Amino acid sequence: GTPSTEITEFIQNNPLAKERKLHSTWCTNEKTAMEVALGMSYAGKRALVCMKHVGMNVAADAFVNSAITGVNGGLVVLAADDPSMHSSQNEQDSRFYGKFAMIPMLEPSSQQEAYDMMDYAYTLSEKLKLPVLMRVVTRLAHSRAGVEVADIREENQLNPDHERAHWVLLPGNARKQYLDLVKKQEKLEEASSKSPYNYLEGLNPEYDYEFGVIACGIGYNYVKEADTDSCHIPVLKVSQYPLPAEEIRTMADRCGYVLVVEAVSYTHLRAH
């Protein structure tokens, strides 16, 4: 459903995708789509599954359990949120699904970043052996721009994991693998703290500021449009989760007031 429909339509109509025999299909529902993509990942291939935010509700069973089984080939779950409900019955925030499943999340702020993040997401997924949730919003999903493209990489060959017991979440397996997932959270936090998509701008740690901004995803673009050279406001850009706690503490310590700009409903994530 919109605003995610256009992604699959573009892939199916793209000449390069056809030339490379990229397999793209519609599924009965989001849970089925999630399971198909997860199966491709188990076989060693990279897979992308796209849905809108309310589709995450339907896919939740397979989505949450995929974090416990883990992945083989890189798996990216793209959730297209719809703030202000342009074509949806609610405006839920899919980032909470990523937090609930305890997996990495990415939120691009521009078309170029969305392009670059996809390769980064697959690499991160294969490194951590976890699915990666990428959140986009309507204003980004319904936009186009020229981007600087990277070289085309060789596709993953079929390489199924020969040890398959962990794919079956009987309690004996699930308990152990859930603990493994909990232990991975430090690696997720480390990846977020070192992420090229989370960074501070215009903040000198030796000075105190009256005002600072934390901008998430496309909110960063809105801040930069409103900013001028005379403002001198420090900005923390956040596009990878878990939240970069150390950078947030720096902002809180150095700024009297901190404004958070994000495309989100009334609830919000907190750094403790």
Task: Set out the residue ranges of the language-model regions.
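Thiamine diphosphate
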Residues: G1-Q111, M118, V137-R139, H232
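Glycine-rich beta-alpha junction loops
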Residues: D82-P83, V137-H142, G217-G219, S265
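Core nucleotide-handling region used for phosphoryl-transfer chemistry
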Residues: D229-C255
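Conserved small/polar residues in nucleotide/adenosyl-binding loops
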Residues: T267-H272
